[in-house]
Each structure stands twice: as structure tokens, then as C-alpha cells.
Regions:
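Flexible, acidic/His-enriched mid-domain "rim/lid" segments that flank
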Residues: 2-11, 27, 108-205
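N-terminal accessory/capping or targeting/presequence segment of soluble
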Residues: 2-115, 181, 185
């Protein structure tokens, strides 16, 4: 019963906030986290055929999305995020807030990315220096080379990722509190039963 209540309450809380609202709130949190990192201009998310599951979880994207082309999502410390997607798949990031741009060819992509990051000097990506954290190392070396060739310094997103992967959100905390209250009630009831049974000298089994 407690487990069912736990699941019901969590589902109800999440359902009360639509996808767009959740995505908008998440991006606000991401920008707050970026601003807490000294000298960081933004966080660049990148994926090709689901190579980066971290990006999908942090951005609250549907993991079942059909993705066959590269996409980028630039979240600056300040200002409006930007989506860069292939023209064949222009709706992959529809659930995320921000301006949308499209590319067709490799040259288009490179030029669009350069325009996107023209003022950014220090960028976080799912990259781990010396592959120290394999779990985090999701962006291929070629893409790192591409971003660096545009004049930006690429740094690890480890400190940012842990704020979303290793910390409860409000809904998870609320669900935990409901479960804790239920367990406390069960413990109190069990000890009450034991006390009553001992006082009456009746069997507990």
C-alpha cells in the first residue's frame, strides 16, 4: 500500500507540470548551476544517435526519440539557449526552450556552431580529461577538436552533471518524505501491537 501511494503521489506531482514547464524550469536550474562555476560561459550538449544518455536525462528529453543526425543544445550562463539541429530532424529538441537553427551540410554545421559559440571562451561538455571518469566521457574526440578549433576551451561538465544526476529534485524529495512518513507509521503501529500483546500476555505469532 505504501509503495503504491509513493508511486501515485510521484506520478501526480510530475503530471501536474507539463513537459514545456518542466523543461523551462530545468533550463533555469542549469543556467544557475553554470553561473556558480567561475569563468564558465555555458554548457554545450551534443548527441549523435544517443551516444550521450546523460544529455537526455539532464535535459529531460525522451530517451526513445528517433535521432539519426547530430544535434547541439547551447545553454549560456546568461541569455537564451539555442538549438542546432539537422534540417531533416528539425523537431528533435522541440520540448526545449530557446531559438532554433538548422544545418544541412558539414560546412553548414561548422559555420552554425561557430556563430553559436562566437563569444564563448570556456565551455563545459561531457568530457573527462584523460578519461578519468569514463561514465562522463560521452563526447567523441573529433567533436571536442571541432569546438576547440572555434577558439573555445572545453572543460569537463562533471561538477554540473552531478548537480542533476546525484541530487534529488523537489518531486523526488517529496516522494521520499511520503515514503518515510509511511514507514514511520508502520513502525509505530508494529511497536504498539507488540506493547499491547505483551501487556495482554498474548502470543505475537
Amino acid at each position: 500500500m505504501i509503495a503504491q501511494w509513493y508511486r501515485w503521489r510521484n506520478d501526480a506531482m510530475m503530471a501536474s507540470m507539463n513537459v514545456a514547464d518542466r523543461s523551462h524550469a530545468r533550463v533555469i536550474r542549469i543556467q544557475q548551476a553554470i553561473r556558480e562555476q567561475p569563468g564558465l560561459d555555458g554548457w554545450l550538449f551534443y548527441d549523435f544517435r544517443h551516444l550521450d544518455p546523460i544529455a537526455y536525462r539532464v535535459l529531460l528529453l525522451d530517451p526513445s526519440l528517433h535521432v539519426t543526425r547530430r544535434w547541439y543544445y547551447w545553454v549560456p550562463a546568461q541569455g537564451t539557449p539555442v538549438k542546432l539541429q539537422h534540417r531533416i530532424e528539425p523537431h528533435v529538441l522541440d520540448g526545449l526552450p530557446g531559438d532554433a537553427r538548422a544545418y544541412v551540410s558539414w560546412r553548414d554545421q561548422q559555420a552554425a556552431l561557430g556563430s553559436l559559440l562566437h563569444s564563448a571562451k570556456r565551455i563545459a561538455m561531457q568530457y573527462s580529461p584523460m578519461n578519468a571518469i569514463p561514465y562522463l566521457s560521452r563526447v567523441d574526440a573529433g567533436t571536442i577538436d571541432l569546438v576547440r578549433s572555434l577558439g573555445a576551451e572545453v572543460v569537463t561538465s562533471a561538477d554540473l552533471v552531478q548537480q542533476f544526476e546525484a541530487v534529488w529534485d523537489d518531486a523526488q524529495l517529496a516522494s521520499h518524505q511520503v515514503a518515510a512518513e509511511g514507514l514511520r507509521a508502520i513502525v509505530d503501529e508494529a511497536f504498539g501491537f507488540v506493547g499491547t500483546s505483551l501487556a495482554a500476555r498474548s502470543s505475537l505469532t
